[in-house]
Amino acid sequence: MDPESFSAAFFKWDQRPPALAPPQMQRSAGLEAQRIFHDFGVPNAAAMAASNNSSSCRKELNCLEELFRNYGVRYITLTKMVDMGFTVNTLVNMTEQELDDLVRTLVEIYRVELLVGEKYGIKSAIRAEKRRLEEAERKRMEQLFVDVDGKRKIDENALDTLSQEGLSVEEPQGDNAIILSQNNTSANFPLNLNAGMDPVLILQNSGHLGTTVSGLIGMPDTNYGSEQTKACKKQKRRRSKDSGEDGEERQREHPFIVTEPGELARGKKNGLDYLFDLYEQCGKFLLDVQHIAKERGEKCPTKVTNQVFRHAKHSGAGYINKPKMRHYVHCYALHCLDIEQSNRLRRAYKERGENVGAWRQACYYPLVAMAKDNGWDIEGVFNKHEKLRIWYVPTKLRQLCHLEKSKQSHL
């Protein structure tokens, strides 16, 4: 039989419907069709995997060609390295010893006849790629530091502007420590505040020195180190727990300097007139809170509480906060009760160049004397004054009055 006629007859399309076969024949024919469909209709998974693997190898080979382009490494050597599973990333991360082992493996195990120039070309290309990556990383870190330093300078300029406009910004550090000097105060006032009352807290500035960032190829860091930041935060929490002033008061220097009445402060720090004005603003915010509470039918606060500080912050006066206002409330009390004595104290400490911490401690003495004249009722002294009755009496002031009263009773 002619093969061509046989093929044409075999593949001729028959338009007539096929006759019904017996059930057993139909089942066998169905199984045969499924087998044929499975063998010829579905793509082979192994072929697809081989195709993907070939594409991946081709991609890695192109990367190796780009790496060793100008270093005299032959194409057959690159192909063998791809077969061994090496990529550009693995080669760059290898040490010199590992590169020697790679060359030795190519020669001894895979029987690749490397030229003398190829051995040095492989190492030279990898060293050059390492230097290129390190240089790119160094430039990226320099740009990052420049951006951070520029942002820091912008923030400092903004803080300077806000400070000159009358906004007080919290700063946890101070140029001096909070130390009560008995030599400077005992000549004017007989009371000793450090007689077993509070430990002397010294705020060290060494926690804000610039450090270097480890792991960043030895680049110096202009920001504070993470270790110093953690230590500073721990020191703040410790001072907050050890504070004898109030339950939530933290002993730290605020951005104020001792100024005479009517004197304007220069630089970032504000004067004492500005500090006393903050207490006047708190009184106005208390009136606002009382007015709102009356409109809502709620209980009106009679003293400056957390609700007043939250209202001040919501109104845009974020520079008014509880720690600062509680820290200097007795100074404001002396200013309200005896402004002449307060002004004399300010002038004296300004002439001596004392910091605001020492001036703050000295403000306790006249208040203790006033409490003595009032039968040691410091609460009554505050309640008699219209501007002071809205403030809580500091715990430290109560303790000093009790201590002085005990000394007087033993005499």
Curated annotation (Swiss-Prot):
The record marks 299, 306, 310, 357 as: Interaction with DNA. Residues 231-240 have a biased composition (Basic residues). Keywords: Activator, Developmental protein, DNA-binding, Nucleus, Transcription, Transcription regulation. Residues 220-259 are annotated as: Disordered. Expressed in vegetative buds and male cones but not in female cones, vascular tissue, roots or secondary needles. It is found in: Nucleus. Belongs to the FLO/LFY family. Probable transcription factor. PANTHER family: PROTEIN LEAFY. This is Floricaula/leafy-like protein. It comes from Pinus radiata (Monterey pine). The gene is FLL.
